[in-house]
Amino acid sequence: ATSGKVIRCRAAVAWAVGKPLSVEEVEVAPPKAGEVRIKIVATGICRTDDHVVKGCIANVEFPVIPGHEGAGIVESIGEGVTSVKPGDKVIPLCIPNCGECTFCLNPEASYCVKSHFSEPQNLMPDKTSRFTCKGKQIHHFMWVSTFAEYTVAPETAVAKIDSAAPLDKVCLLGCGFSTGYGAAINTAKVKPGSTCAVFGLGGVGLSVVMGCKVAGASRIIAIDINKDKFAKAKELGATDCINPQDFNKPIQEVVTEMTGHEVDYSFEVIGRADTMIAALASCNMNTGVFVMVGVAPSDAVISVDPLLLLTGRTHKGTLVGGSKGRNFIPRLVSSYLEKKFNSDLLITHTLPFAKVNEGFALLHAGKSIRTVLLF
């Protein structure tokens, strides 16, 4: 009944940098050719959404509807769309897969040339918006904008998932869980029997812990200044939990003493220059791999002692799991349904969408791992 028509619905709009999100009635236009309109059922609150509101993400334009960790049901499709149909369960992808660019055609690559990092995704590919509010054009965020009851995304940024998937649980697989789990499985390629160190135990850091465990790591050292996170980290597979504030020496020295020769893989899941360097220094020379997972502020700079790299360490970065989302996310959902991992353990709070700012307050206070908003 709604196909081809403008839909009026609720969305959380960031009108300006630093202002709390405002739940507004917005108009969502029908999808154009190659686009999909999705009824969002559930969306997680990710630290990156907080970075958007605070103005820390480069190239985002205001006013904007944030949110990029959602799951929903296809409401209608534009001309030429073949991979999904109305009624399909889907997860929108904050990094698309056009399937045609040099990166999409490279089996080793995972980030499409059409991602936000090479050309901003504040408007749809035709450079117009599908959102309006109070007569004003509202920008998209990474083509997904899941803080809206209905959103429009290009077909290339939509992954069809198993119809048995519970959307209020698998929404995390759109960003937070897949980012951490994939950093261990796809980017680092953690080997059985190896040692790992994970800096930062938020939702993504704990997902790294889960990925390291599934990959067969024999020792997983979890590091955070909030001891309240240690019980959950151990439940998910960490063998050791340490707080840098308990030591009067650099944390990389503590890790070296614990292991005797540094770790095989280290992950920084915070987004701070100092902890990135500490994590790099915590992995061993010759074969140590450091993976940068946390998103640093857009003006951050890291200064590295060249000797750390000259002696053989590898410094890698990863986004949303280091794999092509249209393939990886459906596979992850299948693994979830097969109970290969339990990402539900990351969900500490479930709130109605109207309480979106309460969800951000829980994040700021360090009281939540993941809050899921339900429409």
From Swiss-Prot:
InterPro entries: ADH-like_C, ADH-like_N, ADH_Zn_CS, GroES-like_sf, NAD(P)-bd_dom_sf. The modification N-acetylalanine is found at residue 1. Keywords: Acetylation, Cytoplasm, Metal-binding, NAD, Oxidoreductase, Zinc. Zn(2+) 1 binds at residues 46, 68, 175. PROSITE patterns: ADH_ZINC (PS00059). Its main location: cytoplasm. Its cofactor is Zn(2+). Zn(2+) 2 binds at residues 98, 101, 104, 112. Binds 2 Zn(2+) ions per subunit. One of its GO terms (biological process) is retinoic acid metabolic process. One of its GO terms (molecular function) is zinc ion binding. Its EC number is 1.1.1.1. NAD(+) binds at residues 200-205, 224, 229, 293-295, 370. It is found in: Cytoplasm. GO terms for cellular component: cytosol. It catalyses: a primary alcohol + NAD(+) = an aldehyde + NADH + H(+); a secondary alcohol + NAD(+) = a ketone + NADH + H(+). It is an enzyme of class 1 (oxidoreductase). Homodimer. Belongs to the zinc-containing alcohol dehydrogenase family. Class-I subfamily. PANTHER family: ALCOHOL DEHYDROGENASE (PTHR43880), ALCOHOL DEHYDROGENASE 6 (CLASS V) (PTHR43880:SF8). This is Alcohol dehydrogenase 1.
